[in-house]
Curated annotation (Swiss-Prot):
GO terms for cellular component: cytosolic large ribosomal subunit. One of its GO terms (biological process) is translation. InterPro entries: Ribosomal_uL15, Ribosomal_uL15/eL18, Ribosomal_uL15/eL18_sf, Ribosomal_uL15_bac-type, Ribosomal_uL15_CS. This is Large ribosomal subunit protein uL15. Binds to the 23S rRNA. The lineage of its organism: Bacteria, Pseudomonadati, Pseudomonadota, Betaproteobacteria, Burkholderiales. Part of the 50S ribosomal subunit. Residues 21-31 have a biased composition (Gly residues). The gene is rplO.
Amino acid sequence: MQLNNLKPAAGSKHAKRRVGRGIGSGLGKTAGRGHKGQKSRSGGFHKVGFEGGQMPLHRRLPKRGFTSLTKEFTAEVRLGDLAGLPIEEVDLLSLKQAGLVGEMVKSAKVILSGEIDKKVTLKGIGATAGAKAAIEAAGGSLA
């Protein structure tokens, strides 16, 4: 076997179909475009989503939702993650150093997810009602 003798397997390659080249080809005259109509004309196309003048679906349906501008600057911290911290007084800086919130975060809130059994004092951090009750039950407080 030599490189100049290599050929693709029989039937694996198909010749490009040439349209509009006589009736014997099966795609002569109208070249597979049918008779008349916008799609048969040269340059005949319509925009994506165009429905023939009918009000398009994306305009018939109402707008919904929005993008929050504060999303990347706020974070939530799980109660179980607080229990794993080696410090007793928790503020935003200590959460950033522990890697629990991102560097861009300006405010955080503790949510009731997991358990806490050690005393923790939160400074400048919010907490949900359930998380606040759990922290106070463990002997901690919110400052």
